[in-house]
Amino acid sequence: MFGKGGLGNLMKQAQQMQEKMQQMQEEIANLEVTGESGAGLVKITINGAHNCRRVEIDPSLLEDDKEMLEDLIAAAFNDAARRIEETQKEKMASVSNGMQLPPGFKMPF
């Protein structure tokens, strides 16, 4: 089924890929991305584990209505989460040699 040394090479490649993925997971967990809404009036920075690290609100918004500010905060967080997921996909694609992950697949970190 496997040629001479084929299984050994396959196992070695799998181990190398596992090490690269572990390294990439650590990189991504430490990565910080900022999402914005309201043309940059609200900014939220999250890390690769989707933990909120920082919230910045332009002072001019503090005088406006509460509902609009809440919507802008939610939109900024969603933008940051989308950016983290895109970055994760890009980084993991480089490790997996472009192997496409199934739709909806979430990385375990």
UniProtKB/Swiss-Prot annotation:
<dbReference type="InterPro" id="IPR004401">
    <property type="entry name" value="YbaB/EbfC"/>
</dbReference>
<dbReference type="Pfam" id="PF02575">
    <property type="entry name" value="YbaB_DNA_bd"/>
</dbReference>
<feature type="region of interest" description="Disordered">
    <location>
        <begin position="1"/>
        <end position="21"/>
    </location>
</feature>
<dbReference type="GO" id="GO:0003677">
    <property type="term" value="F:DNA binding"/>
</dbReference>
<dbReference type="GO" id="GO:0043590">
    <property type="term" value="C:bacterial nucleoid"/>
</dbReference>
<comment type="function">
    <text>Binds to DNA and alters its conformation. May be involved in regulation of gene expression, nucleoid organization and DNA protection.</text>
</comment>
<comment type="similarity">
    <text>Belongs to the YbaB/EbfC family.</text>
</comment>
<protein>
    <recommendedName>
        <fullName>Nucleoid-associated protein PMI0140</fullName>
    </recommendedName>
</protein>
<comment type="subunit">
    <text>Homodimer.</text>
</comment>
<dbReference type="InterPro" id="IPR036894">
    <property type="entry name" value="YbaB-like_sf"/>
</dbReference>
<feature type="region of interest" description="Disordered">
    <location>
        <begin position="89"/>
        <end position="109"/>
    </location>
</feature>
<dbReference type="GO" id="GO:0005829">
    <property type="term" value="C:cytosol"/>
</dbReference>
<keyword id="KW-0963">Cytoplasm</keyword>
<keyword id="KW-0238">DNA-binding</keyword>
<feature type="compositionally biased region" description="Low complexity">
    <location>
        <begin position="11"/>
        <end position="21"/>
    </location>
</feature>
